[in-house]
Amino acid sequence: MLQRNFHIITFGCQMNTNDSFWLSCSLQKKGFQEVSLEDASIIIINTCSVREKPEQKVYSILGKIRHATKNNPDSFVVIAGCVAQQLGATFFEKFPQVRLVSGSDGIAMAPDAIERLYAEPDLKLNLTDFSEYYPEREYAFSKLTLSNNNTLALMAYVNIMQGCDNYCTYCIVPYTRGKQKSRSVQAIVEECQQLIDSGVKEIVLLGQNVNAYGLDKDKNSPANGVNFAMLVHTIASLPGLERLRFFSAHPKEFSSELIDLFGEFSTLCPRLHLPLQSGSDKILRRMGRKYSMDEYISIITKLKKVRPDIALSTDFIVGFPGETEEDFLQTLQSINTIKFMSSFSFCYSDRPGTRSSTFSNKVDHEVKIKRLEQLQATQLEHSTSWLKSRVGVETTVLLEKVSRKKAEDNNSWQGRDPWGNVVNVILPQSTNISNTLLPVRIIASKKHSLVAEPLII
């Protein structure tokens, strides 16, 4: 018998994570219960198409689901996200247990669609049409609680836009997320205020290219003339908000007005993720990134002038078609010059339908692997140095969850400092963790995290 319960499997970026969280909250408001994969009647796979062979990953998961749910023949599967947008009704043909395919814009309608599927066993639905404007969603966040897995809901993502108009030559996102569609200022600010009123301390603004907010090609954009710097100014000023971040930005639209806000608002965290992708101007042009290395460094220089303690992270693609050894060495030099606190780096792989998939001068796989290892080793040196430099610093940690390395006689909690570092804080057992933004002193650095002691108990 089909039960009113579900399980969500999520791949990919923070936007997918936020989509899955919203979907979970919405379904629970409708009376569905979130359960384990083995017990679920409805299995939702929120997919990503950015990395290599995404369809194969989804097909593999579907095979495992068939085995895991063999004792529940009435169960069905929902495919959501970017791979759903790409393949659409193909899933119905290959996998009979799939009854809903929901693309990027279809997520807003998915809870009602799942309700229908639960009531109509023979129904199948395809929600892969792009909408003209940002598909607004029902507010589904509940009051701040300490959940069963000892996690505090103190940080929340807020979508401010959908899609992208940049069309970098290697990127599938404009095809799977659609054209850029900014959300209305009023809806964004209202959601942020509702989250703050619910107990949220930190908000992360999300979009494929957040600093292009309001620059939609559609002149009737709901942004109504407001740009990203103006939006950040408004949200950073909201009473009760402790921390504000945004992800992901693009160097091309990084304005002086936005840079100045880092010096104006302590609420705006001293941490920025700004994808560089390559340190070679030649490769940046082939990627269609529309900025030079000098322009990127100029942004960093201005940021450090207004916020000297700012920490920077980035993305790199290694082995892009046409990348020579000299191009790669320029990328290594960019790491040594800017000293990123961390980076996400991957070997280039073709995405069908993108311009770069047709480029000649592909780099050999062995060369790509060797370069990636060299880049990651260089980055590790700077990441280690950054973490060591934090020892002795007094700061605040936003507690998130019980640490996996819980000491036997202590109450060990994990959280993040304003720079986004993972910090494990050892507290006496009797500590009341209601003081969730905790003043601490960093006492040690680990490979990927920090250890701190509380300054106030």
UniProtKB/Swiss-Prot annotation:
Cofactor: record remark: Binds 2 [4Fe-4S] clusters. One cluster is coordinated with 3 cysteines and an exchangeable S-adenosyl-L-methionine.
GO molecular function: 4 iron, 4 sulfur cluster binding; metal ion binding; N6-isopentenyladenosine methylthiotransferase activity
PROSITE patterns, alphabetized: MTTASE_N (PS51449), MTTASE_RADICAL (PS01278), RADICAL_SAM (PS51918)
Record-annotated MTTase N-terminal domain positions: 4-119
Catalytic reaction annotation: N(6)-dimethylallyladenosine(37) in tRNA + (sulfur carrier)-SH + AH2 + 2 S-adenosyl-L-methionine = 2-methylsulfanyl-N(6)-dimethylallyladenosine(37) in tRNA + (sulfur carrier)-H + 5'-deoxyadenosine + L-methionine + A + S-adenosyl-L-homocysteine + 2 H(+)
Domain TRAM span(s) in chain numbering: 388-456
Chief localization: cytoplasm
The protein, known as: tRNA-2-methylthio-N(6)-dimethylallyladenosine synthase
Coiled coil (UniProt feature): none
Quaternary context: Monomer.
InterPro entries per the UniProt record, alphabetical: Elp3/MiaA/NifB-like_rSAM (IPR006638), Methylthiotransferase (IPR005839), Methylthiotransferase_CS (IPR020612), Methylthiotransferase_N (IPR013848), Methylthiotransferase_N_sf (IPR038135), MiaB_methiolase (IPR006463), rSAM (IPR007197), rSAM_horseshoe (IPR023404)
Superkingdom of the source species: Bacteria
GO cellular component, one term: cytosol
UniProt function note: Catalyzes the methylthiolation of N6-(dimethylallyl)adenosine (i(6)A), leading to the formation of 2-methylthio-N6-(dimethylallyl)adenosine (ms(2)i(6)A) at position 37 in tRNAs that read codons beginning with uridine.
Repressor recorded as keyword: no
SMART domains: Elp3
Binding site for [4Fe-4S] cluster 1: 13, 48, 82
Cofactor field: [4Fe-4S] cluster
Localization, UniProt: Cytoplasm
Domain Radical SAM core per the UniProt entry, residue ranges: 150-385
Keywords assigned by UniProt, alphabetized: 4Fe-4S, Cytoplasm, Iron, Iron-sulfur, Metal-binding, S-adenosyl-L-methionine, Transferase, tRNA processing
Binding site for [4Fe-4S] cluster 2: 164, 168, 171
Enzyme Commission number(s): 2.8.4.3
Stated family: Belongs to the methylthiotransferase family. MiaB subfamily.
